[in-house]
Amino acid sequence: MYPSNKKKKVWREEKERLLKMTLEERRKEYLRDYIPLNSILSWKEEMKGKGQNDEENTQETSQVKKSLTEKVSLYRGDITLLEVDAIVNAANASLLGGGGVDGCIHRAAGPCLLAECRNLNGCDTGHAKITCGYDLPAKYVIHTVGPIARGHINGSHKEDLANCYKSSLKLVKENNIRSVAFPCISTGIYGFPNEPAAVIALNTIKEWLAKNHHEVDRIIFCVFLEVDFKIYKKKMNEFFSVDDNNEEEEDVEMKEDSDENGPEEKQSVEEMEEQSQDADGVNTVTVPGPASEEAVEDCKDEDFAKDENITKGGEVTDHSVRDQDHPDGQENDSTKNEIKIETESQSSYMETEELSSNQEDAVIVEQPEVIPLTEDQEEKEGEKAPGEDTPRMPGKSEGSSDLENTPGPDAGAQDEAKEQRNGTK
């Protein structure tokens, strides 16, 4: 059945030699024709070629970044001619060849495939094992054992068939296989109904691709019979529609959108914090600090020097009244008044300081601007002074009842002050 020269070769040596060869080197040793991968249209390309306008295709291409339809193909023909990284063999439990597609693959691959399969000690249903492709254009052969249904299927049959595809795809990922072709598993002499088998195959591969689309370039559904071709063509439109985006890609885009909005949300949170800090800053500005205390001390010194009006008990003296009383207060300076006013101002300042420390919003007393008197004004004030019967008390205000009731200096002191002013004049 096989050429005699192939029987004499040791399969291990042949496998090692073939796996080291480049694609061009292997092509020189092909014994049959082959079908390169680039000649097999993807499902997306095939659907575009069926009466769709170029404008629609351009729109779809721009909208669909990564479509699963670019990863799958439907091909009707001989699986042993496909030049892909691996083909899947619907094998029996012994892995020693049989009827249907299993026999075709063994015959095309040569005796070394059978020799290696004997070394694998069979395979359980739903599992898969991998060998070299030998004389096949495919680099590897993945052997999987499907369930025997005999026309009647149950949950166990469906699970076993799905596991055939899952275990085969696991080997694809582990061996860095970029292109693989699947036949119809268990639909031949094993009697699994064609349509349910196609649904399981398409659904299982779609779920795997959604998570591992970057692991492969192409998965080919290779059918031989017309009935299977019609079923797959119909079902692929349902499972792999042209505008069916990669689910994982959509998740990635959602993450990217969230990352883009993240900094903006962070900014807004930071801005809100800054605004709250600013608001807190405005509230704390009114609390008296060292600078305000110094200002109060300066005001105190000015009061001592110029006998200005004083606020008592935390009440603010009316500015207009203080402006009117200010010149007269300067005119009636005397040693006794200065001592008395100094004492009162000190007690008033202490009371004001206590109140300001207890209040949240301190009231900063603004002192009126003091305009020094010129010589002419002093002379006029001096002329006006003798005509006055009683001097006006410095620091007198409408709201200070204590100052109004305070007795003035004795008459002798007043006469003495008048004589001094007249003598000066």
From Swiss-Prot:
There is a cross-link at residue 170 (Glycyl lysine isopeptide (Lys-Gly) (interchain with G-Cter in ubiquitin)). Changing residue 100 to A: Abolished hydrolase activity and ability to bind ADP-D-ribose. GO terms for biological process: brain development; DNA damage response; peptidyl-glutamate ADP-deribosylation; protein de-ADP-ribosylation; purine nucleoside metabolic process; response to bacterium. Substrate binds at residues 77-79, 90-92, 97-102, 185-191, 224. Residues 344-360 have a biased composition (Polar residues). Subject to product inhibition by ADP-ribose. Changing residue 188 to E: Abolishes interaction with ADP-ribosylated proteins. Strongly reduced ADP-ribosyl hydrolase activity. GO terms for cellular component: nucleolus; nucleoplasm; nucleus. GO terms for molecular function: ADP-ribosylglutamate hydrolase activity; deacetylase activity; hydrolase activity, acting on glycosyl bonds; O-acetyl-ADP-ribose deacetylase activity. Keywords: DNA damage, Hydrolase, Isopeptide bond, Nucleus, Ubl conjugation. Residues 244-262 have a biased composition (Acidic residues). Residues 243-425 are annotated as: Disordered. It holds the Pfam family Macro. The keyword Amino-acid biosynthesis does not apply. Its EC number is 3.5.1.-, 3.2.2.-. Residues 59-240 form the Macro domain. It is found in: Nucleus. Residues 302-343, 381-391, 415-425 have a biased composition (Basic and acidic residues). It catalyses: 2''-O-acetyl-ADP-D-ribose + H2O = ADP-D-ribose + acetate + H(+); 4-O-(ADP-D-ribosyl)-L-aspartyl-[protein] + H2O = L-aspartyl-[protein] + ADP-D-ribose + H(+); 5-O-(ADP-D-ribosyl)-L-glutamyl-[protein] + H2O = L-glutamyl-[protein] + ADP-D-ribose + H(+); alpha-NAD(+) + H2O = ADP-D-ribose + nicotinamide + H(+). Removes ADP-ribose from aspartate and glutamate residues in proteins bearing a single ADP-ribose moiety. Inactive towards proteins bearing poly-ADP-ribose. Deacetylates O-acetyl-ADP ribose, a signaling molecule generated by the deacetylation of acetylated lysine residues in histones and other proteins. Interacts with ADP-ribosylated PARP1. Belongs to the MacroD-type family. MacroD1/2-like subfamily. This is ADP-ribose glycohydrolase MACROD2. It comes from Homo sapiens (Human). The lineage of its organism: Eukaryota, Metazoa, Chordata, Craniata, Vertebrata. The gene is MACROD2.
